[in-house]
């Protein structure tokens, strides 16, 4: 493997290592999973909540693939796609309006920059509430279902999410969430969101694949807003506050939109010592 350049970015503290493969594969397909496990390690690697691969696409302007710290590939990531959009736009690959192919489908994006920094508005598609589309066991919708002592609702916003409304967010998320994340109700597992309703939504998310709480989750924020809207708790636009900062979630008809920032942290080259472990 030749020299491997990377870019480190974050969206509200949800941090990613980006590998640009638009002009050629940098990490072979059969090594991407293990490479992501190594690169994401916060002690022995670069550290991150996932590795983003910017790749060519025949269906959209560019493509995105995301491998998580456990080596699994995720269908979609809301914070990750904003980071990828920032790199693609600043590299001159795309204009202010473009589309990104993901495993969850083709995602339209609009980007801008103001005095506060870079922002991306992402069309997140129509949240899917049918159990067959989440997926979850059974038929119909999965709303306010008793599970492990909580009322759990579930929705797919690119990836499956469980949403739980609580009065107090000061709870041991990493002790409680794995029981729901691995519940037999969800054959592919689920991300788990604990949500407090106030003037805005406050969300803490335990992410599948990261297997830990992250500072922010874009698809989780959309899931929280979508379930709250479905239950009549919020209107067409809502601010979602994560530990890493706010996201603006809005709806036009049934389509959901997410708007938020992305920040470039650094650029670098993976050391020869780490490269040797990838070969």
Swiss-Prot record:
One of its GO terms (biological process) is lysine biosynthetic process via diaminopimelate. Pathway: Amino-acid biosynthesis; L-lysine biosynthesis via DAP pathway; DL-2,6-diaminopimelate from LL-2,6-diaminopimelate: step 1/1. The record marks 161, 207 as: Could be important to modulate the pK values of the two catalytic cysteine residues. Substrate binds at residues 14, 68, 78-79, 191, 207-208, 218-219. Its EC number is 5.1.1.7. InterPro entries: DAP_epimerase_DapF. It is found in: Cytoplasm. One of its GO terms (cellular component) is cytosol. Coiled coil: none annotated. The active site is at residues 77, 217. It comes from the Archaea. The keyword Amino-acid biosynthesis applies. GO terms for molecular function: diaminopimelate epimerase activity. Signal peptide: none annotated. Keywords: Amino-acid biosynthesis, Cytoplasm, Isomerase, Lysine biosynthesis. It catalyses: (2S,6S)-2,6-diaminopimelate = meso-2,6-diaminopimelate. Homodimer. Belongs to the diaminopimelate epimerase family. Catalyzes the stereoinversion of LL-2,6-diaminopimelate (L,L-DAP) to meso-diaminopimelate (meso-DAP), a precursor of L-lysine. This is Diaminopimelate epimerase. The lineage of its organism: Archaea, Methanobacteriati, Methanobacteriota, Stenosarchaea group, Methanomicrobia.
């Amino acid at each position: 493997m030749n020299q491997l350049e990377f870019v480190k970015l974050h969206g509200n503290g949800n941090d990613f290592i980006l590998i640009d493969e638009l002009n050629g594969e940098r990490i072979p397909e059969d090594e991407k999973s293990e490479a992501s496990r190594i690169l994401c390690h916060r002690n022995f690697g670069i550290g991150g909540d996932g590795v983003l691969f910017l790749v060519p696409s025949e269906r959209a302007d560019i493509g995105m693939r995301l491998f998580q710290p456990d080596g699994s590939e995720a269908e979609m990531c809301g914070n990750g796609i904003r980071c990828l959009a920032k790199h693609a736009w600043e590299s001159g690959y795309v204009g202010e309006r473009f589309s990104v192919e993901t495993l969850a489908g083709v995602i339209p994006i609009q980007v801008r920059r103001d005095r506060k920094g870079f922002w991306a508005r992402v069309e997140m598609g129509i949240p899917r509430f049918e159990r067959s589309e989440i997926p979850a066991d059974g038929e119909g919708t999965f709303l306010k279902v008793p599970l492990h002592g909580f009322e759990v609702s579930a929705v797919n916003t690119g990836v499956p999410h469980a949403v739980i409304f609580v009065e107090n967010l000061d709870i041991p998320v990493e002790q409680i969430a794995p029981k729901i994340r691995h519940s037999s109700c969800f054959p592919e597992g689920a991300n788990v969101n604990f949500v407090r309703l106030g003037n805005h939504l406050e969300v803490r998310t335990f992410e599948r694949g990261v297997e830990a709480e992250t500072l922010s989750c874009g698809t989780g924020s959309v899931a929280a807003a979508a379930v709250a809207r479905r239950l009549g708790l919020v209107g067409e636009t809502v601010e979602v506050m994560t530990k890493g900062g706010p996201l603006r979630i809005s709806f036009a008809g049934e389509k959901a939109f997410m708007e938020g920032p992305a920040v470039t942290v650094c650029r670098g080259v993976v050391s020869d010592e780490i490269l040797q472990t990838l070969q």
